[in-house]
Amino acid sequence: MLTYAQAGVDEEKTAKALRAIIDAARRTFKFRMNKIGEPGDIGHYSALLDFKDFYLAITTDGVGTKILVAEAVNKFDTIGIDMIAMNVNDLICVGAEPVALVDYLAVKEPNEDVFQQIAKGLYEGAKEAGIAIVGGETAVMPDLINGYDLAGTAVGIVEKDKVVTGEKIKPDDIVIGISSSGIHSNGLTLARKLLIPKYGLDYEYNGKKLWEWLLEPTRIYVKPILKLINEVEVHGLAHITGGGLLNLKRLTKYGFELEMPPIDGIFKLIYENGVPLEEMFRVFNMGVGFMVIVPQEEKENALQILNKYYESFELGKVIKEPEKIKVKNYGITL
């Protein structure tokens, strides 16, 4: 049995340590009070800055330890997609259209071939997301870093009457799940430490090598979500990343009653190697990379739109019971 904390990522410890930084950040809000760019609160997927007629949304994220798998097999051509995805999927959670991104690449030493591979993924990700990469920073730090780290900061725009924060969510709203492409870019530390020592990266599982399962690019949900919010009343949007289903708690005080898909693919291999069921749903997306909350009368319209892009399905509903996430078909509550 192995948990995320035992693998080295203790989220409770991290949250506790972050309090000082978050408190300091909130104290800086006064520097923009009653000025262009006055910020809202911290805690949603993207921060919203007030620009009178619209909000500027801003977020930052990285690839994480997925890049260690890329380094191990010398295949870096998709991690740029992951970095773009992790940022733009957070922007659309507030209804924002992604506009621009700057990247941050830290390396021990520059490698032209690796940089070309990363650039390929960045371009493909930007193309799918409809975003411009307008700058960045490459830091060569042989005394500090061993290998590579890739992150980015993205901005988007949303009209004030189109912003989605979750405040409209109410009991009996319908939760729709959009399928993931696999593990995406979260929980890789746990997956790597659990599976690679036992099987090796070339282990064949259900027709693919382990490294292929781990490097499958994160799905980009920009096109279906922007289409959806222009045609359907949407009450909430959730990118299922670090924290798994707990991400739903960012949106509302209400709880959720869900039936999740069968455990399959890379998640089945991880689960069969001893990760507790509750931990699986706290760490991984479990086959659902994005969730949409809509009123009951919009369910069919939403499903029709979303299924034109990726497999989408009704997962359950919002319940009055506060802050409980019940996964009925697995008998767990988070």
UniProtKB/Swiss-Prot annotation:
The keyword ATP-binding applies. Transmembrane segments: none annotated. Disulfide bonds: none annotated. It catalyses: 2-formamido-N(1)-(5-O-phospho-beta-D-ribosyl)acetamidine + ATP = 5-amino-1-(5-phospho-beta-D-ribosyl)imidazole + ADP + phosphate + H(+). InterPro entries: PurM-like_C_dom, PurM-like_C_sf, PurM-like_N, PurM-like_N_sf, PurM_cligase. It holds the Pfam family AIRS. Its EC number is 6.3.3.1. Signal peptide: none annotated. It is an enzyme of class 6 (ligase). It is found in: Cytoplasm. GO terms for molecular function: ATP binding; phosphoribosylamine-glycine ligase activity; phosphoribosylformylglycinamidine cyclo-ligase activity. GO terms for cellular component: cytosol. The keyword Metal-binding does not apply. Its main location: cytoplasm. Pathway: Purine metabolism; IMP biosynthesis via de novo pathway; 5-amino-1-(5-phospho-D-ribosyl)imidazole from N(2)-formyl-N(1)-(5-phospho-D-ribosyl)glycinamide: step 2/2. Keywords: ATP-binding, Cytoplasm, Ligase, Nucleotide-binding, Purine biosynthesis. GO terms for biological process: 'de novo' IMP biosynthetic process; adenine biosynthetic process. NCBIfam families: purM. PANTHER family: TRIFUNCTIONAL PURINE BIOSYNTHETIC PROTEIN ADENOSINE-3, TRIFUNCTIONAL PURINE BIOSYNTHETIC PROTEIN ADENOSINE-3-RELATED. Belongs to the AIR synthase family. This is Phosphoribosylformylglycinamidine cyclo-ligase. It comes from Pyrococcus horikoshii (strain ATCC 700860 / DSM 12428 / JCM 9974 / NBRC 100139 / OT-3). The gene is purM.
